[in-house]
Curated annotation (Swiss-Prot):
PANTHER family: PROTEIN SMG (PTHR38692:SF1). It comes from Shewanella baltica (strain OS155 / ATCC BAA-1091). This is Protein Smg homolog. InterPro entries: Smg. HAMAP family: Smg. NCBIfam families: PRK03430.1 (NF002897). It comes from the Bacteria. Belongs to the Smg family.
Length: 157
């Protein structure tokens, strides 16, 4: 499923091509690209649920204390290793993510059918969430810079 999400993001969203095709047309294209029907349906459902999160009707997205600290469940810790959780905390500290977008990211990560998610894949999920979150264009651009900018020169001598 994650491969399909990446395919859609790279071919439609990130390339700035309008995603105005209907679901049947998109399913046919993804099938021609070699993806299986069941995985296509999972990916499209994942995207639909991401769009639903923007409506703000989830209780965990409505009320929060700015000084609260996120405690991860066992399932979340199994899927997101220490490095990934640290990266989410870093993004909050530098204001790329806020409480709501962090929870959207975690929600979408937990819906992926991968048992664990490596940091590079987490970065793409974050980018997808920020792209779909109205009013977070600046955060999206910052995240895009974090993904695509390569450090110049040597880090260590």
């Amino acid at each position: 499923m994650f491969d399909i999400l990446m395919y859609l993001f790279e071919n439609y969203v990130h390339s700035e091509v309008e995603l105005l095709v209907d679901e049947d047309e998109l399913t046919k294209e993804l099938t021609r690209a070699g993806f299986h029907q069941s995985e296509i349906l999972k990916a499209l459902t994942w995207l639909e649920r991401l769009a639903e999160l923007q409506e703000g009707d989830k209780p965990y997205l409505c009320n929060h204390d700015q000084h609260s600290f996120r405690i991860y469940t066992k399932d979340e810790m199994d899927k997101l290793d220490v490095e990934s959780r640290g990266f989410l905390l870093f993004l909050e500290q530098v204001k790329v993510l806020n409480v709501e977008t962090r929870e959207m990211v975690i929600d979408r990560v937990m819906e992926l059918d991968e048992p664990t998610l490596i940091l590079e894949d987490l970065k793409w999920v974050i980018l997808m969430v920020l792209f779909n979150a109205p009013g977070h264009e600046s955060a999206y651009e910052q995240m895009e810079d974090l993904i695509f900018e390569q450090p110049e020169g040597r880090l260590h001598s």
